[in-house]
Amino acid sequence: MRLCDLPDGSSLQHDDGRQWDEWVGIHGKPPSWMLTWMKSRWGNVLAVLCLVAFVLVAWKWVLPAASEVVVDWLPPELEQKVGRGAYAELKKRWLDQSDLSEAEQKKWRDMFESMLRKAEPKQTASDWRLFFHKSKILGANAFALPGGDMVITDELIYMLKDQPDTVMGILGHEFGHVQHRHGIKMVVKAGMATAMFGFIIGDATGFLATVPTVLMTQDYSRQAEREADAAAAQFLNANDLHPRVMTVFFDRLIASRVAKYKEKSDPMEDFPIGFSSHPPDNERIKFFKEWKP
């Protein structure tokens, strides 16, 4: 289809674009070489390649930088609202009621609160909430949500029940994500990406409904994981524990993966979300083993 605006404000429209172009070529001013080239197959290929390059550059560098700026302007109340909304949805989809008694849950919460008070004296109980859930889907896992909510699964507690220091280190890692606001940064980045794609394809509706899935399926960046690992190391060190206690978790999880997925060549492949492969797990194990204040 072709559309031509006339000087008096009216317009001409023709449904057959090829016929219109032939007529203009004979009776009117020929199109520029740039327009002709852009209409060609190679022009379309270049346009697609440029679009792909733009999206990759935006995802890798522009969106992370922009999300940092946006998050700095977000009020804590909004971040908390996003996190609690995500938690409510996760309870419907993937999280079941914990089998741990209220007394046992309180024991773990009190232990973490005591250690956090020693490591981060300025933090208060209102800055975080710790929930326990059973989950066949997530298995041995722990993760943090925007606004200070953290979840640890029964399966992880059972795996490390005789290693409370390691459990505390994992919670210290998740609280590191809370402190650095990694969760809300990931949500903002995904939201900006959705808006960008919506601008390109014309549909950006329904993003808020995908926030829980975004939080549970998107890996943190290498830098975010390093920051959370550093926070866990500092947390443990402040409580007179060497961060090498974290390696117990990796060792046991690898063993459980090997037993469950003998046919898989890489037992690290199914590491839980909170400890996904960014940076490589061997690098993280080395970090905890060799950590020095």
Label each region the model flagged.
Residues 2-32:
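N-terminal intrinsically disordered, acidic low-complexity segments at the extreme N-terminus
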Residues 26-293:
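A Zn2+-metalloprotease active-site environment signal
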